[in-house]
Every structure is written in C-alpha cells, then in structure tokens.
Curated annotation (Swiss-Prot):
A ubiquinone binds at residue 201. Component of the ubiquinol-cytochrome c reductase complex (complex III or cytochrome b-c1 complex) that is part of the mitochondrial respiratory chain. The b-c1 complex mediates electron transfer from ubiquinol to cytochrome c. Contributes to the generation of a proton gradient across the mitochondrial membrane that is then used for ATP synthesis. Keywords: Electron transport, Heme, Iron, Membrane, Metal-binding, Mitochondrion, Mitochondrion inner membrane, Respiratory chain, Transmembrane, Transmembrane helix, Transport, Ubiquinone. The gene is MT-CYB. It is found in: Mitochondrion inner membrane. It comes from Oecomys bicolor. PANTHER family: CYTOCHROME B. Pfam families: Cytochrom_B_C (PF00032), Cytochrome_B (PF00033). CDD domains: cytochrome_b_C (cd00290), Cytochrome_b_N (cd00284). Belongs to the cytochrome b family. Heme 1 (or BL or b562) is low-potential and absorbs at about 562 nm, and heme 2 (or BH or b566) is high-potential and absorbs at about 566 nm. This is Cytochrome b. It is a multi-pass membrane protein. One of its GO terms (cellular component) is mitochondrial inner membrane. Heme b b566 binds at residues 97, 196.
Length: 381
C-alpha cells in the first residue's frame, strides 16, 4: 500500500515542500528566518483579523475603536500589541533574511530573489498603510508626509496624490481605502510567498559553503522541522517579552494623541523598521531626488545578480568582501539611528555620508573586492 502523503494530490504538494524535500545537510540557523517569516505572517493575519472585527475605519471613531479594543475587548490589548510588535519582528526577520541572501549569494537564484524583492516592497506598503489606521498624530502626519512624496513625480504628481487621498487632504476617504488595502495586501503577500517557495524548490536551497550540495542532501523532516520549531519558539519568546513587558518601546508616544490636522508633531518619524530608508530620503535636499533615492535603496537589491563577478558563491571564503559586507551592515544601522534623529547638524551630515556610503558599497566597493579576490585566486591557481 502506497503512503497517502505521496499519492494524494493535495497532501503530495505539502510532502514535497516540507517533508520529503531534499535539503543541504549543512544549512545554518541563518536559513531559519524563512520559516520565521511564515510564522510572523500567520500571526499578523490572525491578530489582524480579530482587530478588524472591532475596528472602525472612520476618522471620527478610528482612534476610539482602538482604545475600545485595548480597554473593553477580552485580551484586546494583547491582540493589538501582538499585531504592532509582530510587525517589528516581521521586519527584523525580513532584513536578516535579505542580509543572509546577500552574504551567501542566494541572489543568484534569480526568480526567487526577484519575487523576494517584490515581497519586501509589498510588505513595506502593507506596514505603511497599517500604521495610518490607529489615526493618532503620527499616523496622520506620517500618511500626509509619505503620500505627499508622490507629488514630486513630474506632471501627474499632484493629481496622483489627490487621487490617492480621495480629496484635497488626508481624510475619511484616505483612512477607509488604507484599511481596505491593509486588509487585502497580506493575502496577496501569502500568494506571493507560495510563488517564492515554488521558485526556490525548482533550484533547491543554497548552503553556507556555496558549493553544489546535490551529493549531500537530507530530508527536511524531521531534521529541519525541529530546527525550525526551535527558531519559532525563540521568536515567540522574544515577541511575548516585547508585548508583555515593553509593548510601547518601538512605538511613538505621539500616536497616543488623536490625529489633529492643525497641530504638527515636533519630529515626524516613521516606524522603527523604515528609519534607514527615511534617512536616505531626508539626506537629499531635492524632493524628487529624495524619492528616487528612497525607491533605489530597496530596488538596488535587484542589481546584486548583475553586479556579481565573483568566481565563488557567497562570501564564506572571501575575506575582503566580508569586511565590506560588515561595514555595509554597520552603515545600515547608522542610517537607522539617523532616521530617528531631528533634522539638524551633525545628524544631517552623518546621514548624507551614510547614504552615499550605502550606494557606494553596493555599486563600487563590492564589485572591486570581487575582482581583487578573483585575481588573487588566479595567482594561486
């Protein structure tokens, strides 16, 4: 008798993806973040669904409905903070996942990488429209500032902004449509995740050595199911510590003040996970230039496969590029710090230097390091 999981049309797909999947025997914990992202997405959709049951997307009642969720709904405070801090954990896992992809050369799996970039952009869009929903001061002014950036687009900019707003300012129509977007996008993300996995399983996973691992594969279950389970437990533990002890540490105090179009907050700063991009945006004095730099800060990821000239897969045996990579990570952390600082000296100057460094490292330094390493290899061949 044949095993049902190998013959049943539906279960067979799950079997080939999570049970009998041939996996490299040496993939490290850096490969855990894919499954952690899946868990984050499920947590966000579940908590989001329960929040949507009590939330009202009307400017008059949105802020009050969030207060009502926290005060009157059974465990509403828990659901709300799980959703808010779950988003932060989601982005931390996302950035580590992308960072691992850059370090180990996973961008050479072109289709998987490109779908991943689209996923990153879609997730950022989802988080942005979600941040507007509580209708606090930072929600309102964040929405105003970021949507206003589109007015920098020549010729159609102003019309486009008013079209997105559904009026001449961020108002009731904007909030309603942002709620609609925030509800539908996670399901689109889920569909794209399946495509992401489909392309990944076409080629198989990369591994830390960067060598072909066809001769040394092990089944995904039980080895990596349990390894993933450990990662999930650690993720949930960190998330629960965050939610139960420091629920507001990543939030903004201004968002506990209801939205007021007549009063601008002293410093408009986005959520913790967008600060690096916000710093790049602010570092360019020209509006259109800033918007283009903001877009390029993410889209430049698509250039990695094109800029790669190394004879080796990944940075495991490439010490020079490793040094540049870690300088790049440090630079990214500096940008994150600058994004949360006021627009004044010396922060503006540091931001400009860090922004130039961000693009210089990717476009110039990494390819040069690859060429040097290739020449060293030739000398010792």
């Amino acid at each position: 008798m044949t095993i049902m999981r190998k013959t049943h049309p539906l279960i067979k797909i799950i079997n080939h993806s999570f049970i009998d999947l041939p996996t490299p025997s040496n993939i490290s914990s850096w490969w855990n973040f894919g499954s952690l992202l899946g868990i984050c997405l499920m947590v966000q959709i579940t908590t989001g669904l329960f929040l949507a049951m009590h939330y009202t997307s009307d400017t008059a009642t949105a802020f009050s409905s969030v207060t009502h969720i926290c005060r009157d709904v059974n465990y509403g405070w828990l659901i709300r903070y799980l959703h808010a801090n779950g988003a932060s954990m989601f982005f931390i896992c996302l950035f580590i996942h992308v960072g691992r992809g850059i370090y180990y050369g996973s961008y050479m799996l072109n289709e998987t990488w490109n779908i991943g970039i689209i996923l990153l952009l879609t997730t950022m869009a989802t988080a942005f429209v979600g941040y507007v929903l509580p209708w606090g001061q930072m929600s309102f002014w964040g929405a105003t500032v970021i949507t206003n950036l589109l007015s920098a687009i020549p010729y159609i900019g102003t019309t486009l902004v008013e079209w997105i707003w559904g009026g001449f300012s961020v108002d009731k129509a904007t909030l309603t449509r942002f709620f609609a977007f925030h509800f539908i996008l996670p399901f689109i993300i889920t569909a794209m995740v399946l495509v992401h996995l489909l392309f990944l399983h076409e080629t198989g996973s990369n591994n830390p050595s960067g060598l072909n691992s066809d001769s040394d594969k092990i089944p995904f279950h039980p080895y990596y199911t349990f390894k993933d389970l450990l990662g999930i437990l650690l993720l949930l533990m960190v998330l629960m510590i965050l939610v139960l002890f420091f629920p507001d540490v990543l939030g903004d105090p201004d968002n506990y003040t209801p939205a007021n179009p007549l009063n601008t907050p002293a410093h408009i700063x986005p959520x913790x996970y967008f600060l690096f991009a916000y710093a790049i945006l602010r570092s360019i004095p020209n509006k259109l230039g800033g918007v283009l730099a903001l877009l390029l800060s993410i889209l430049i990821l698509a250039a990695f496969p094109l800029l790669n000239s190394s004879k080796q897969h990944g940075l495991t045996y490439r010490p020079l590029t490793q040094i540049i990579y870690w300088i790049f990570i440090a630079n990214l952390l500096i940008l994150t710090w600058i994004g949360g600082q006021p627009v004044e000296y010396p922060f503006t100057t540091i931001g400009q230097i860090a922004s130039i460094s961000y693009f210089t490292i990717i476009i110039i330094l990494m390819p040069i390091a690859s060429m040097i390493e290739n020449n060293i290899l030739k000398l010792h061949a």
